[in-house]
Amino acid sequence: FTKGMQQMITSGCILMLAWTIGGVCRDLLSTPVFVKTFIETTGLPGALLPALVFILAAFLSFATGTSWGTFGILIPIIIPVAQSICPELLLSSLAATLAGSVFGDHCSPISDTTILSSAGAGVNHLTHVSTQMIYALTVAGCSLIGYLIIGITNGNLLLSLGTSIFILCIFTFIMHRRSKTILNKKDICSTQ
């Protein structure tokens, strides 16, 4: 019980500090206003917002090793930005924040979950990171395409999700055929 409480206290402190940083960015630094003005002055189309948020969340959580900290930093910034630029994309921008944060945390070599997973499995930490990266990058690429489509279609969830799943299935099929071909060549070479 006490070990579990110790882990919860650490997580709670990280979450509280992330909310504090998010509040400082929102209230004192006016980050949402800055981001909104930046997007408007650079001429970036609002349709790119979910995809850009996904990429930003992925990089931030990869660098920090925490998805919850990234939630606390980005969500208070993304909500007002999405509401002012393109309100139809608010939910997809929030989804992109969550998905990008979890992706970056999953791939980060400094993430507590990655460290505990490799230790629990009894494998080399960097080997674990590199083997997880292949699968995570595949899904992240399909997700990024989905976020681009949902932004371009102004929130068409069915088209976005369907396209992402279709691309993932095609990629999986191609990789499966490729691996069978490689394995068959190895079998032929070993019998000669």
Enumerate the language-model features and the residues they cover:
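Core transmembrane alpha-helical segments of multi-pass membrane transporters/permeases
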Residues: 1-30, 47-59
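Short amphipathic alpha-helical coupling elements at transmembrane boundaries
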Residues: 2-7, 33-41, 115-119, 126-130
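Membrane-interfacial loop-to-helix junctions in multi-pass transporters
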Residues: 5-12, 39-55, 82-93, 157-158
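Short helix-coil transition sites and intra-membrane helix breaks within transmembrane domains
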Residues: 9-10, 23-30, 60-72, 102-111
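Hydrophobic mid-bilayer segments of alpha-helices in multi-pass membrane transport proteins
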Residues: 12-18, 51-52, 73-78, 158-171
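Transmembrane helix-loop junctions in multi-pass membrane proteins
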Residues: 23-35, 63-65, 143-157
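Alpha-helical transmembrane segments of multi-pass membrane proteins
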Residues: 47-61, 86-106, 131, 137
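Juxtamembrane and boundary regions of transmembrane helices in multi-pass small-molecule transporters
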Residues: 99-189
